[in-house]
Amino acid sequence: MIKNEIKILSDIEHIKKRSGMYIGSSANETHERFMFGKWESVQYVPGLVKLIDEIIDNSVDEGIRTKFKFANKINVTIKNNQVTVEDNGRGIPQAMVKTPTGEEIPGPVAAWTIPKAGGNFGDDKERVTGGMNGVGSSLTNIFSVMFVGETGDGQNNIVVRCSNGMENKSWEDIPGKWKGTRVTFIPDFMSFETNELSQVYLDITLDRLQTLAVVYPDIQFTFNGKKVQGNFKKYARQYDEHAIVQEQENCSIAVGRSPDGFRQLTYVNNIHTKNGGHHIDCAMDDICEDLIPQIKRKFKIDVTKARVKECLTIVMFVRDMKNMRLIRQTKERLTSPFGEIRSHIQLDAKKISRDILNNEAILMPIIEAALARKLAAEKAAETKAAKKASKAKVHKHIKANLCGKDADTTLFLTEGDSAIGYLIDVRDKELHGGYPLRGKVLNSWGMSYADMLKNKELFDICAITGLVLGEKAFEEKEDGEWFTFELNGDTIIVNENDEVQINGKWITVGELRKNL
């Protein structure tokens, strides 16, 4: 029997039951990532990486809020399945806050143990932090078997201890002059398709810290005791040594090649927008608006934005973006209005467009892709036209009785309906057929097959003879100025002075030599 009932879950129950909404997949999956200078297929649990990122993001947010006067040193350590993130920030505000049940607890306790508690809910125009939903660090706590948060404001320290996904929690005040925040946790591997923080998680974390060091050069990052270096130009050139780099006050962008379709690596403030968003759309729209017309003028070929995009890799770091809009807690895509993005990043798209035109390594794959698409489209049109011709019935075709049978028949092409009347009187009905042309046949030299078949006479000739443009129907022989064609058993010898010319002014010889 199907139950018809309503359930009300607590925040923590909902997070555990629908974890994908908050931290992403808990399955061990294969994803393509760019790590240490090359694209790799990496197997890991995205949700587990999210737990580490949430704590790192909190420290980076403190640096952003204080314009890097504080939290300008962030240390990350991963050892024996235990993660520690420490910063030299101001510490989490320790003022007492009231919970929905009326209980008063210190601010750090609320931030680490209650979902939807935090200091980033103000959607004012000046907010530039990555945190926005108030669930980040509590998510890490919920999916940990051990979680210890320590924070100090220079006068007092608060230590919060939790275990088994916050089933057990306690806190204490300890007077002290230390200022900063330190979080240590061990993930609950029962919630994920893995049983350890293997080397791949260390590599992914180090790779992210290298990226953050590029985005925020004012922060000194260390990983397992070693300083992490950051330089945008060097970082971008890992993706493509020929990459075009442009650095503005609020945005750094690199445009390089991609042999396997469009690729991107983008950060907005400290958030990895792995599915891109409106900032990527803005950049591509503005670059293509200038680039596509120039390609058309220079190479006489039409190219679309989709064709340009599929040949490129974009590395884009946006800094100090105010009140950004992101999809869900996973924050994988930026959805801020286009106008806000354009006014903030101030990209010189025309210069990037000119640089692409002058960079053969990046430009030529775009041209080659456009040509390949054009040829494929033409071939498809030709095939369609040829198929149509093969099934067509030509009403003015006077058919030889043995046409299509095991006999050598001849098709006579006459100039006009009146001329074919003489043929009808003298022809051998068994072997001779005819078709009246309307004047001289179209000069089709240089035309595509699809365009040639738009001409009624050429279409009808192909329909009558079964010739398919582009396929060799006979063997061509050249002897001085004379050309010999063998067609259906008949040998026809012509030269350039014959009535049917070979230089392309008429079709019969010229086009047969070129196309058939």
Swiss-Prot record:
This is DNA topoisomerase large subunit. The keyword Cytoplasm does not apply. Binds both single and double-stranded DNA. Its EC number is 5.6.2.2. It holds the Pfam family DNA_gyraseB. Large subunit of the DNA topoisomerase that untwists superhelical DNA. Controls of topological states of double-stranded DNA by transient breakage and subsequent rejoining of DNA strands. Keywords: ATP-binding, DNA-binding, Isomerase, Nucleotide-binding, Topoisomerase. Residues 369-400 bind DNA. It comes from Enterobacteria phage T4. PROSITE patterns: TOPOISOMERASE_II.
